[in-house]
Amino acid sequence: MVLALLLLPATLSYAKPYELRMLNHWDNLDGTIERGYAGRSIFWPKLQRDKIEEYARYNEQLGINAIVPNNVNASPKMMTDEILQQTKELADMLRPHGIKVYLAINFGSPKALGFCETADPLEPAVAQWWVERCKRIYQLIPDFGGFLVKANSEGQPGPLDYQRTHADGANMLARALKPYGGQVIWRAFVYSPSDPDRAKQAYLEFQPLDGQFDDNVIIQIKNGPIDFQPREPFSPLFAAMPNTKMLAELQITQEYLGHSMHTAFLAPMWTEFLADVNKVAKCKLVGLAGVSNVGDGSQAGNAPTVLNAPGVQSPLFTLCGNHVAEANWYAFGRLCKNPGLKAEAIAKDWANIFFNEQQQMMDSQQRRGNTQKPENSLTTLLPRKDAVKVLTSMLMRSREAVVDYMMPLGLHHLFAWGHHYGPEPYCAQPGARADWMPTYYHRADAEGLGFNRSSHGGTDATHQYPAKYAAMLDDMKTCSYQYLLWFHHVGWGEQIRHKVGGRAYEESLWLALCRHYQHGVDEVAEMQKEWQKLEGNIQPAIFNDMTKRLECQYRDAEWWRNGCLLYFQTFSKLDLPQFVPSISHSLDFYKSVNLGLTNYECPTIQLLDEKR
């Protein structure tokens, strides 16, 4: 872990820090972490005090000032005295570091815990129960931040169960918190299985409620209208609720970008989003909430075992699943404090800090006589300036590489069922909701590919955006190629203009699709080459671990390219171009791959080698 942070002057531009700079943890009371790829919870079932102290110091230096330590799919037990007492102990640990604790709550808690016959927010007994709970919480935690609520989404209870609105539910809680200065953060991640376009749902449910929320209610909105895809347009809600406080939810953990196995530096995604929110939506956010990638470091099977003397921490230990993934935690914190930073400047700063840490750790090992030489005896130490340049380049190309080999040109939701690791554009789960299936999103057929969200025979999702931006998106000729298949169903032979690796092309959709998938694979190969240049600058254990992860990422990129192109080829009936290498496996082989993972783990390299 990087603890001696040096927040270097990355750029002369400066923007005012966000008021609320929050991490959301999807940690469960049993210690599992939903979409967690770095081990088990440091908060539950018991407080891991040494790791929490390390976590708190790091957050303090980044400027994080609030956390939610539990899953938004919250247990009603969060409101029991036992859990509140443990939360008090956590708050006591974080307070010296300037960090407030909020709790995610289950809206149905008064009913689920047996205190009320209903959870109707307009029922006086329900409102009074929350008043009494808030009174107890603030007796224990005087600076308690408030509640985070996921309601009427993916099976969670909420006010709509009682024919009430989101505003009714949020305001009832807000009034219970109001005397103590507490806030309600109400998530806008909602979607109905019956609507023809999931991307429109949050707007349809929340935009009519603009101005109806109390002043201590904040609406937390995911950056895009679906769910943390490698690339999404910004959610139209950011441009549609001028009388409501809004918080942007970003995902630091890589649920859809290769878990802790793939290198994907997310600052370019976030700065792209913030630029659109500022310039197009003209929205002033209250803050940022990042879905954290922190665990206790116990994620098994991905890294070689390292034996250490008693009291000496393994060089492979990290709270983030792998050492390079720490860059995303760092980038999130930097953007919270200064939203005007450029992604490349953040990458450069983190690379400097990373190499400082590596040098300190190697010096410490040398003093103890515990030096491990690089496997290649000819390895040389790059000058610091050159090493930083190489790592910065690798980070900056990584996210776009992931977009290209997973879901280019605006494709989305092509991942595997359940655990979301690997490609499954052909996924078909009997009895499952249509909007959980990739076919709902890619709409591949003999004519073409993509979801028609235009006003020309589509769902007209484009017109949820501001007028000029909507007009640009609505026209296939002016819509950015990066969002083309998000908003349009495009013919396989239709000529499109796009860019790959900075070079412009005008060619058929099929050729463009193939070119992006191949470019993504090629970019991972370049990332591997860049990493190899750094061998002498990095502890051997960490260098070798990341080398193996990058090898795995390359094979995964090929898996994505092969599975997706073979599948889409069944519709296009077109040959693969010469720049795509021959694919040795059949589509049936890729359809047969089943990793058997849960939502709480990252696949091991061994498992991936066996299965794909």
Model-derived regions, located:
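Catalytic-core regions of glycoside hydrolase
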Residues: 42, 81, 89, 115-348
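Short, basic, low-complexity termini and linkers enriched in Ser/Thr/Gly/Pro
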Residues: 3, 8-10, 358-381
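Mature, folded catalytic cores of secreted/periplasmic enzymes
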Residues: 62, 92, 96, 109, ...
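Catalytic domains of carbohydrate-active enzymes that cleave complex glycans
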Residues: 289-358, 378-612
